[in-house]
């Protein structure tokens, strides 16, 4: 449905009065959504086809640089949306923060504006079945449970202030045993080390911890807590889903509960801190309801970390399916099924999604790249190569290749599969011939090379070569970048026409919990039309030569961060 399409009206009996015989195509009232019959609005045709036209699901998409709210129809098509960018704070080298109340206010403003557009199309709020939340992962928020006020800025996922702390923790004998429990290697990336740094270095956080009033959460927990009314309601909603909890290093990957051994390793006393309760990603009750504003009374029924949400939005429900999201960073998830696979080749093991009920949680191998779209922003904002980030592809396309330039975009060290925390961003191969176009092209290639390295690691861990790669995210809009990805990786790259897959995933999680879709089979045709496939065009020897040169550059970027040489 186009974003400005006019709604269609229909008046018929309520669902309770409808024939539920299968041959009549009426919606059955048994199964996952049966307990939601009492919430159905009156006067809407309830065949499966008409249900999808008239039900809507909202999706909060809270990312690293912006917040958005989208409303999808029952066919998985976005109807309206609103987006707001907010300030990213860099108070010191390697530090990256958000103001927690600004995250919240940006989400609330997006909801108000999108709902205004929704009403302008003639739709009532009652047609919104529920909303889901997807969010930047690992970003750590701490607040006072008695006042609901943040105690410090949110420490964002690529922040590297914890490098010295991580080295100290790695020196402990038990550090090598953590990955088997939680799926993550010890690094600056997960929430655990961010929380520990805050307790050790921020007086207000330490005092709240000692007094038992420190609340911790990732961005999903913070938003759910606040949208439900925060500390002002009798029983504050303080929860997280298992995809977000799996990024903290506090959750056991198999039990999906907090693990005493993991908490003890980081010195976290669960009796002195309020940790969010871990719940499934799709549930009609656990996440509460929006307390105020244009969505007051609407259920929050889904929650997924952004990369898990993108996998769901791409329809990656079968083992062997994979997606790569090219956003601020770059994140490749590979569905491994209902048993976790602990990587031997530098990847993360994580929860892909957990839809609760009788279904088992599904796991994934993940490769994370710290810099993707942020590399383009660096060329735009810091170096002034172009006026707008969208112009980088044109600049990169002005030259036939990178002219021998290799850009290791290690602004926050290198993540998977390398895990080199002492690397810094480094340009190799510059000559008098080098132009802005060569550096722009090398910036796009850096993401493609790192993706290829992750794909190679996934093939080793799984024993199977990926047949194609589904892609989304802002940088996937660049045909040049996607063709380069196909050439370097040697596999087709599959891009959907509707790129809002991350937001769609959260909508799917909420919709499955509240009857918009009753099973995964109902989603087979969602986001399938208009996909574009980029097939490899470069000869394999040429691609391998470029990738080998990239590997050489990675090795040469090591060792730039040394405490005795740093100011």
Where are these regions (language model features)?
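Short glycine/proline- and acidic residue-enriched helix-loop micro-motifs
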Residues: 96, 175-186, 359-361, 537
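Short glycine-aspartate micro-motif
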Residues: 55-61, 69, 125-133, 215-216, ...
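Short beta-strand-to-turn element immediately C-terminal to the catalytic PLP-Schiff-base lysine
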Residues: 72-73, 142-144, 199-200, 224-228, ...
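Glycine/Thr-rich phosphate-binding loops that ligate phosphate moieties of nucleotide
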Residues: 2-84, 88-91, 101, 129-172, ...
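Conserved phosphate-binding catalytic cores of ATP/NTP-utilizing and phosphoryl-transfer enzymes
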Residues: 38-53, 286-321, 334
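Phosphate/pyrophosphate-binding loops at sites that engage ATP/ADP/AMP, CoA/4′-phosphopantetheine
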Residues: 109-129, 202-208, 260-271, 454-467
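N-terminal phosphate-binding loop and adjacent alpha-helix
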Residues: 82-124
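Gly/Ser/Thr-rich active-site cleft segment
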Residues: 62-64, 178-307, 364-366, 372-376, ...
């Amino acid at each position: 449905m186009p974003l400005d399409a006019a709604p269609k009206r229909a008046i018929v009996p309520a669902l309770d009065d409808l024939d539920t015989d299968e041959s009549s195509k009426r919606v059955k009232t048994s199964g996952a959504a049966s307990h939601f019959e009492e919430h159905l609005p009156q006067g809407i045709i309830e065949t499966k086809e008409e249900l999808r036209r008239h039900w809507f699901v909202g999706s909060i998409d809270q990312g690293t640089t912006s917040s958005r709210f989208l409303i999808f129809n029952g066919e998985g098509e976005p109807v309206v949306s609103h987006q707001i960018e907010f300030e990213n704070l860099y108070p010191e080298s390697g530090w990256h923060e958000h103001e927690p109340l600004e995250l919240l206010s940006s989400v609330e403003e997006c909801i108000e504006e999108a709902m205004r557009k929704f009403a302008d199309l003639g739709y009532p709020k009652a047609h919104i079945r529920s909303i889901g939340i997807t969010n930047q992962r690992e970003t750590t928020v701490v607040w006072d449970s008695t006042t609901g006020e943040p105690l410090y800025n949110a420490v964002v996922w690529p922040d590297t202030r914890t490098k010295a702390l991580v080295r100290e923790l790695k020196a402990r004998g038990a550090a090598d045993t953590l990955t088997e429990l939680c799926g993550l290697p010890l690094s600056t990336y997960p929430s655990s080390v961010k929380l520990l740094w805050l307790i050790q270095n921020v007086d207000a956080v330490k005092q709240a911890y000692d007094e038992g009033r420190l609340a911790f959460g990732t961005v999903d927990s913070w938003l759910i807590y606040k949208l439900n009314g925060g500390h002002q309601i009798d029983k504050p909603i303080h929860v997280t889903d298992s995809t977000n909890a799996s990024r903290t290093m506090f959750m056991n990957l198999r039990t999906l509960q907090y693990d005493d051994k993991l908490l003890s390793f980081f010195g976290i006393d669960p009796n002195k801190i309020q940790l969010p309760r871990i719940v499934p990603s799709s549930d009609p009750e656990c996440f509460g309801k929006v307390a105020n504003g244009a969505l007051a009374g609407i259920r929050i029924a889904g929650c997924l970390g952004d990369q898990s949400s993108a996998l769901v939005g791409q329809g990656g429900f079968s083992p062997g399916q994979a997606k790569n999201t090219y956003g601020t960073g770059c994140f490749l998830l590979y569905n491994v099924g209902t048993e976790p696979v602990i990587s031997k080749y530098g990847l993360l093991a994580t929860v892909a999604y957990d839809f609760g009920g009788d279904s088992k949680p599904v796991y994934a191998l993940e490769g994370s790249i710290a810099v993707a779209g942020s590399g383009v922003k660096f060329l735009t904002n810091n170096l002034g190569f172009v006026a707008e980030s969208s112009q980088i592809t044109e600049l990169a396309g002005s030259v036939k290749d990178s002219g021998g330039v290799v850009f290791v975009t290690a602004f926050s060290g290198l993540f998977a599969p390398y895990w080199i925390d002492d690397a810094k961003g480094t340009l190799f191969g510059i000559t008098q011939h080098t132009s802005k176009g060569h550096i722009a092209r090398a910036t796009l290639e850096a993401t493609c090379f790192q993706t290829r390295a992750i794909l190679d690691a996934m093939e080793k861990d799984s024993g199977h070569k990926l047949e194609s790669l589904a892609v989304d995210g802002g940088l996937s809009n660049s045909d040049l970048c996607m063709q380069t990805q196909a050439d370097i990786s040697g596999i087709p790259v599959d891009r959907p026409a509707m790129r809002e897959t991350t937001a769609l995933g959260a909508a799917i999680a909420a919709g499955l919990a509240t009857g918009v879709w009753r099973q995964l089979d109902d989603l087979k045709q969602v986001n399938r039309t208009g996909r574009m496939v980029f097939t490899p065009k470069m000869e394999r020897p040429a691609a391998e030569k470029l990738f080998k040169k990239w590997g050489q550059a990675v090795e040469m970027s090591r060792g730039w961060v040394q405490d005795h040489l740093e100011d």
